[in-house]
Amino acid sequence: CRASYYFRQSTRDAEVMHILAKAGVHVSYHFEELAEYAKQNRLRSPAAVQEAMPEIQAQFVENLHELRREFGLPMNVVCSHGDWMNRYLKMPNRVLTHDDGLRTRAGIISETYDDEVMMPFAAYVSDDDPPTYWARGNPFELIQQGTSPLGILTHPKLWRSHWSSNARELTVRIREALQFKFGKGWK
């Protein structure tokens, strides 16, 4: 069994990250610059996002280098975060890492959704909101069936996190959605 932990800018916890890294766990960046840039700059179309891609990439590289400096970790395998804005745009954050030049500049070996990362898994499941709990299969059933290797994606907020953290994040999402729906100046 091997685990990796990816931290967003908004969820990074220096103490936890250091403890995990010292224990030999892979710790890296859970990035979301594309969605964040689109929301901050009121972009509503993939074309507008593509036009801004050089700025988005620069922000991503800057954030990644800052995390590497702060934690002294290679962070050369990164993981894209999914946001409501990505679903609206039909454009995942990982679009950033499709650029080989960016990968070279940023020192990225792979992104967790790259084919070479996903292909070895016989099955890949993700936790989901109750009452479903699992998307793409139940890991307990897959283990009993002898499915191996198995990739399992989990999110702390779906299992046991501090209620105020979840409430705060939900409040931000609602505010963003209302601004998006009723705000002026979206491109």
Regions found by a protein language model. Name each.
Residues 26:
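Hydrophobic "anchor" residues on beta-strands that sit immediately upstream
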